[in-house]
Amino acid sequence: LFSWGNEGHPLSQEETTPVPARFDYHYNDSVLASADYIKQHLHDIQLLDARSLAEYNGHKAFANKAGHIPGAVHYEWTDALDKSKNLRMLPTTEIKNALAAKGLNQENTVVVYCHSHHRSSLSFYVLRAAGFTQIKGYPGSWSEWGNLADTPVEV
């Protein structure tokens, strides 16, 4: 909506009447990671933390523990948005270069997380658009990891 309105496209405040429709889907849980999965695979996965730098560094804590999952790289979800183009996604070549500079490799499984998997769900899409194929989202994210007694943390 931000981009749409700022680019001069029409907006309306009229109410619309929903039209019934059928939506068929296949639930694919192979793209999800759990806390147990991450603990078991810390040595052979890559982690992308999509939270703010203050959350990643442990300066802001919204859980019992502050910091990030060991080995996680920071790539805030907004880093993929072009502020000069109404928050449209940056060109994939720029995103690929930024992720490569952080050490993320397309051949490895990358698990994305934030605090509640809202921000990192965009990061999941961004990685997919940038050509990553082995991506998992962590729905529990920091709201789970940061409150579990047996999870390691880095700051």
PLM feature segments, named:
Residues 1-46, 50-155:
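Rhodanese-like catalytic fold shared by cysteine-dependent sulfurtransferases
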